[in-house]
């Protein structure tokens, strides 16, 4: 079973103004597999990241759920944070929410948090793999763009195969 840590961010007042952060922490800390849950004003800050790293080490966390603002803004931040603490960077889930009504927003936050916890329970670490690469290209289409692409690739020293569905190459240019 995973040992999951839940980290709920206030995002200053952005989240805390519309979500009862304490209620979210209380609801999520009793979920199966959760061994640590806390909240902090800015999880993306250096001190917030240290809270995450310290908890991973202290509690032996195998996965984390970060309830914060948009993954678009901070996914890389949190991925690096958990990796720096020795956790696989893909063993984390991030959820965010938007609502005006505090009760609805809090309910949604709890549901999203539970969903993220369930997902982390099932996660398996991703590992790097290498595959042999054949340095050869296939160009589909024998029009002028396909021909030029094939020539450019060949000029760069790679083998090229070009396929065309018609019996001749040149596309519309051959009709001029």
Report residues per predicted region.
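Residues forming the flavin
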Residues: 1-176
